[in-house]
Amino acid sequence: MYAVVKTGGKQYKVSEGDFLKVEKLEGAVGDTVEFSEILMVGGDKVVIGTPLVPSASVVGKIVEQGKDKKILVFKSKRRKNTRKLNGHRQLRTILMIEKINA
């Protein structure tokens, strides 16, 4: 069984036992998180939401809180010898999907 979950402005296809890297979620390591915005549930019978599937949810456990790899942002203006280099590390949460309720 699988589901399509919407979180952090993005959509993820998940199954039970999957590890999922998403935008930062509040909570400590070991806490459970429940997603109620389920767009689709699949398995023997596929249910597509309009826009959400009613009474469906996905439960996951927070495995790790941390930062992603560094992204370098380089800006320059031509012929002016003006350069700017910035680095950015996005906060992220790693989840383990425990249960899909459909």
From Swiss-Prot:
Alphabetized Pfam families for the sequence: Ribosomal_L21p
GO cellular component: cytoplasm; ribonucleoprotein complex; ribosome
InterPro entries attached to this UniProt entry: bL21-like, bL21-like_sf, Ribosomal_bL21, Ribosomal_bL21_CS
Record keywords: Ribonucleoprotein, Ribosomal protein, RNA-binding, rRNA-binding
A Gene Ontology molecular function term of the record: rRNA binding
Keyword ATP-binding: no
UniProt record, GO biological process: translation
Name of this protein: Large ribosomal subunit protein bL21
The organism of origin for this protein: Geobacter sp. (strain M21)
Gene that encodes it: rplU
